[in-house]
Amino acid sequence: MDTDTRAVERRSRVTISDLADALGLTKGTVSRALNGYSDISASTRQRVRRKAEVMGYRPLAQAQAIRTGRSRALGLVLQTDIPGAQRPFLSDFLAGVTTAASEESWTLTVATSAGEAEMLATLERLIDERKADGFILPRTGTHDARMRLLRSLNVPFVLYGRVADPDGCAWYDILGEEAMREAVLRLVSHGHRRIGFINGGMEYNFSGLREEGFRQGMADAGLDLQADLMLSGAMTREAGSALTR
């Protein structure tokens, strides 16, 4: 390794100018080589990339976003108006998302909002400020305003959950309706006949699916539904415990 390269590596950040000086090329040539422009020969592109790796060059995210129009960041806006609603799954969920994003050299931009109006305003702000190229939408609603907004702005998104009409949507979900049906049948197999059902908020699509599964399980077991044992609105463990009592 030459002296100039070692000196640069001792600095906090390697720049395009440092690379250009080390390679004896212009900054424009180095920049175009790093971005894969075809007017730069394959051998030069490879040479520049190898030197960038050796010197530890990393492009500034903000400058890269301005140049390419992409931030290489996913957006996630969490609701804070229901205390504790995210708690049962949030840590594992964030760990999975950030790990997958990092493997593709992407980052995760996380924001919070209280209520639908603030949620939509936050999504628009992250888009306008180029802080996210697309969004993950957890806890899908039966009539999800986030989807309508992002579709109108032609911004991609992935649903964590389902909607009534999933055509054209990328989504992933657990089969909550099947899990609920199996839960009912498991209780029946242990001799239980008076089975209660504590559901989440009915504004969320998963709650409707879970109720479908519960009703199907009761029907499969030949049991009648008891309206006084079917309650909804529990979005936290504490709320569920209170309704159970």
PLM features: what roles do these ranges have?
Residues 1-72:
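N-terminal helix-turn-helix DNA-binding module of bacterial transcription factors
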Residues 57-122, 219:
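Amphipathic helical "hinge" segments at domain boundaries
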Residues 132-138, 196-198:
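Periplasmic-binding protein-like
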Residues 1-9, 22, 54, 96-105, ...:
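Bacterial carbohydrate/catabolite-sensing allosteric modules
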Residues 26, 72, 133, 193-194:
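Short acidic/polar active-site loop segments enriched in Thr and Asp
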Residues 119-131, 240-245:
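Short, well-structured alpha-helical segments in soluble
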Residues 115-117, 138-143:
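Short beta->alpha connector loops
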